Amino acid sequence: MNLEIVSLNKEYNEPWNRFCGESNDAWFWHTTDFVDYKLNFRPALESKSMSFMVKEGKEILCICPLFLEKKDLDNEFVYEFSFGGDYCPAPAFKNGLTESRREEILKLVFSVIDEKARKYDVERVSFRINPLCHNFLES
């Protein structure tokens, strides 16, 4: 089956949040409640959600919270992918994927991010793995 990139929208809030509750990589920062909070956290950043998921059929395999934000660097505006001015949460994967499958999906995720970065002239992106998520604690 083919992998599909789907943008996060209200239609997918429930499955996205359910995925967050099931994935050992996800934490509260990945949920749509926190995404909505961060979108409104610092209005000066003019945050726009670029969050997306990777699906195979009806199954979500990975989610990636991502915002396009405008940052003022000494009166020069640049665009970056961030999360209310902070690091973006690292992509979260479905439990039980093999390492090779995770790598395949991660390559796709970063190719999508690269494509969006070129489209919007993004200067940088930073991700953070939450130290409270299950997979980090178990490593």
What are these regions (language model features)?
Residues 1-139:
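N-acyltransferase acceptor-side catalytic subdomain
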